[in-house]
Amino acid sequence: MTRPPGKLIGAFVFLLLAMTLIGYLVFRETTIKRPPQISVTTAGYVEMCVSCHAKVKLDTAHAANVVGCSPCHLGNPLAISKKEAHKGMVLNPGDLRVVDKTCAVAGCHPTYGSRVKKSLMATNRGILATLLYYWGEADNQNGDYSVKKLMDSGRTSLALDYYRKLCATCHLWKKKNDLPGYPKFFNEKGGGCTACHDVQPKGEPRMTITSFAGDSGNDSKKNRPHPLIIKKVPEANCIRCHNRSGRIGLSYIGIFESEGYGTPYQGCEPSPHRLPGNRFYLKIADDVHHKKGMVCIDCHTQNEIMGDGTNYAHYEDQLEISCVMCHSKNPGTTRKNKKVNNIEKKNGHFVLIGKIDGRQHPLDLPNKTVCLYPGHKRVSCEACHSTWVPQCYGCHVKRDERETQLDKLTIKATAGWWQEGRSYIRYEKPMLAVWRNRVVIVTPGCQDVVTTIDKNGHISGGFNRFTMAAISPHTTQAKGRSCKDCHASPKTLGLGEGTVVEKNGKWRFFPVDKGLNTLEGRTVGLDNFVTIDGKPLQHGSRKDLRP
């Protein structure tokens, strides 16, 4: 029997392969799910994504039929199959890791990407530099540090380990829903642009600082409606981060984080009024601007929030607004000589126009008798009109090498478990000091008592660093503090709570707070900023800040 020629065998194999391929293609073409028509945006671009996601509802400017899906979420808008269409997709276009390919491309918001990355909300430069300086790891508090540099380098130290584990959820490089098992409130922080510019659609629960859920925000992304992309940022988005440290977000809406007693009790049970982290709170006087219906963005400008492209060291450098921007004869100009876009003259009177609701707020001039009194020339507006401020005394910080804790930048648990506690917290009689030749309000910021525990459970080190920091409390009231409250209060003057006594022509002060026993010995009283002879007892948050 003769064998068939090799060429014949090759041709047969080729024909078999060709028929198999054709069969596969025919099968795929007859079984693939095709949209009834090609989807095209109003700009004329083919966007097959809309064929599947036609029911997604967005705001008008970002509607799918206008923008499509791929300009924001990337992927392949020409593909028909889900697998091909979703290749290279990003869940959050606002993430600063991808923003240059999404939100910040030409035709959308091209200048914002680089600006936001240099903003203090993204870099945390002031927080990092000041922490390192306070803890003796830097020569000054103006160093060029950033969250991005920490993520790229992996750099750590005692101070940076503390930041990574207890502080690093309030910056724009944080990803949304990146903290397994953490409450939803913490998972909703961060996300770059979407940290501020997205909200849940109407009908969906919108989380606030006092109505947070205890579930984890990263357990299920299915069946979650697409958030709305908004320009008019609600105050709830700001307060996601601005509810610790200076607590200005809480103070503005009249919330004071109280002691952990849970008083006043309700029905023999601790108070139900709690903040994330199981913190109790009291409702007291909110800021007069909040009473009038104003939100954060009504005052704060785009450049000072999102940055203007300059790598500022501290927020007072990035800040543009001041009280006189509104309350002066010719309002509407910032400290950096820029015009704001929501102050207008109506019927002969200046008004501020709310950016969310369009409400007109009349701008009153300062009281000539009190505010313009010659003796008050150096007194800042908030020194009189901020009637309360959160004062967190004694920050007890412990690091235990025997336990691990989640590093919020790497999302990995590493050795060293940090715990914080305080001596006490108060709100009354804001203390005054002098900064940049102006009388300002100060509050503890921070009064660190640091202790480290080694692997054997022994104390391996520790130090104290007490600092008073200038603050704009965001608790403005129409009626200012009384003369007595400033001129006859030892606490307001920086001495602390106590009694002033004159004997034999000499003045003496007897403080209520006697200080703490620490590894470095007895401290000064926590609310004692200065002696009656004018000697500073604690550091100032800036070199030129003094009692």
State what each model feature region is:
Residues T2-L58, N65-S70, L74-D178, Q200-E204, ...:
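C-type cytochrome heme-c attachment and multiheme electron-transfer modules
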Residues P180-Y182:
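Extended, Lys/Arg-rich, non-catalytic nucleic-acid recognition/anchoring regions
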